[in-house]
Amino acid sequence: MLRTPTVSALVRNVAVRAAKPTMAVRAASTMPISNPTLANIEKRWEQMPMQEQAELWMALRDRMKGNWADLTLQEKKAAYYIAFGPHGPRALPPPGEQKKVLAYTVAGVFLSFVIFATMRAFAKPPPATMTKEWQEATNEFLKAQKSDPLTGLTSEGYNGKGHVQSPSASA
């Protein structure tokens, strides 16, 4: 290959053109979507195959990129329904679901009460340290030991209950 200035310039231009990134631009569709396609979309949307749903949504999205005054009433209704309609996660609950939720909640609370009552019925009695007499004796022991003289039982002017928290054993 000859290395002339003309050939070098031609090769340079080809290399520069190849290095420039080109972006594909998709033009918004100017043709309205046919009425039979959009007719009764509220009832047909859930039964449509996913591919057909995606194609219809893309076509509507392309139409919405243009002037909204050019959209037909059917297209506006379909776009609104697809975007905000009661389908998918926004679907209305089936009839009777509230009663079912209430019934299961009541059953769960009742079952937890039965488990609690059963455990209380077969539990051991409270320990001896949970009597009022034992707790008063604990207070006297701590006073004799001069425990916590700054803020506790043996501090000046203390008038709290100390460790007493249970009813008397004779009660």
From Swiss-Prot:
GO molecular function: cytochrome-c oxidase activity
Chain ranges passing through the membrane: 101-123
Membrane topology: Single-pass membrane protein
Annotated region described as Disordered, given as residue ranges: 145-171
Residue span of the annotated presequence: 1-27
Record keyword Ion transport present: no
Location of this chain's protein in the cell: Mitochondrion inner membrane
GO cellular component: mitochondrial inner membrane; respiratory chain complex IV
Main location: mitochondrion
Entry-linked InterPro entries: Cyt_c_oxidase_su4_fam, Cyt_c_oxidase_su4_sf
One Pfam family recorded for the sequence: COX4
Keyword Transmembrane helix: yes
Subunit structure: Component of the cytochrome c oxidase (complex IV, CIV), a multisubunit enzyme composed of 11 subunits. The complex is composed of a catalytic core of 3 subunits Cox1, Cox2 and Cox3, encoded in the mitochondrial DNA, and 8 supernumerary subunits Cox4, Cox5a/Cox5, Cox6, Cox7, Cox8, Cox7a/Cox9, Cox6b/Cox12 and Cox6a/Cox13, which are encoded in the nuclear genome.
Cited function: Component of the cytochrome c oxidase, the last enzyme in the mitochondrial electron transport chain which drives oxidative phosphorylation. The respiratory chain contains 3 multisubunit complexes succinate dehydrogenase (complex II, CII), ubiquinol-cytochrome c oxidoreductase (cytochrome b-c1 complex, complex III, CIII) and cytochrome c oxidase (complex IV, CIV), that cooperate to transfer electrons derived from NADH and succinate to molecular oxygen, creating an electrochemical gradient over the inner membrane that drives transmembrane transport and the ATP synthase.
Name of this chain's protein: Cytochrome c oxidase subunit 5, mitochondrial
Organism of origin: Neurospora crassa (strain ATCC 24698 / 74-OR23-1A / CBS 708.71 / DSM 1257 / FGSC 987)
Lineage: Eukaryota, Fungi, Dikarya, Ascomycota, Pezizomycotina
